[in-house]
Amino acid sequence: MLATQQSKSSNTFEKANELLASDKVLSEQERKDRLKAKRIRIARLRQHEAKFQEEAQWVFKHFTQHFSAVLAQSEKQLESAYRIRHEVFCEETRIFEGNDTKLESDAYDEYAEQCLIQHDKSGDYAGCVRLIMPEADNETLPIEKQGVQYIDRKDLLPCNFPRNEIAEVSRILIPKVFRQRKIDKAACAANTGINIELYDENDIRCFPFIAVGLYMACTAMFKNRGKKHIYFMADPRLGKSMQVVGLTMTQIGDEFEYVGRRVPYYIDFENFLENLKPSFKFMLDEMIKTIK
C-alpha cells in the first residue's frame, strides 16, 4: 500500500514538473503578448478615467445651472416623490405591489424628508431620495430591522449613537427616461408625458450625473440637520459607483437580500466631508444654498 502511495506521489510529482516546464515554455512565448495586452488594458482604463474626469468636471460646474435640488414640502412635491417611487418600484421593477393612487409610501415617511432633483426649464422631476431621520427612541432605521444581523462592524451599529445624530438614505431613484443615454423623443412624450424638446444637449449631458446630484442633495440635508452617522443599504452596483466617483463609504457587512441585493454601508459624515473632492464641494455648496 505504501509502495502504491509512493508510486502515485511520484507520478503526481512528474506531472507537476511537466506542467511547470510547459508553463515556463508557454510563459516565455506568451510573455511579451501578455505584457502588451496588459499595457493596452491599463492605457484604456487610464483613457476612460481621464475622459470620465473631464466629463465630470464639466458636469459638476454646469449641473446646478440646469438642475436644482428641491426639498419636498408641499403636498404636490411629496406626491411627486411618491409617484417616482411607485413608477420605479411598482411599475418598472415590480418589487412592490402597485396601488390605484400610483403613490408609494410607508411608515418610515412619517419621520423622513424627501428631496427631488428638478430640471429647471421644464419643471420635471428627474430623481428623488428619502432621508430617514429618527428623533424618538421608538423611531427606527430600516437597516435596524432588515440588515442589522448582517453587520459585522458591531462598533458601528446605529444603537451606539444618539438617535438625533443618525440617519439613513433610502429610495434613491431616477425615472427610466433620465437613465437613458439615447432618447426617442416621440416615445418619451407619449409614454412619460415629458416634453424632451425642452431639454438641450447640455441638459441631456447631465443625465448620467443625476445620481451624484441626489448624493449631494443628501449631503446638504445632513449637513443642515446636523447628522453625524449615515447608513445606506445600497444595491452593490450603486455602492460601487458611489465609490468610483470618489464618495467615501465603509462597507460594514456582507451582501444580503432585501428588496433586491443589498450591501450595508456606514458613512462618518465628518470624514466624508473632509475627503470630498473639490468638484463635489462646488456642487454641494450650491445645493446647501437651496436646501434649508
Model-derived features: positions:
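Short amphipathic alpha-helix that is part of the acyltransferase structural core
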Residues: 55-103, 110, 114-118
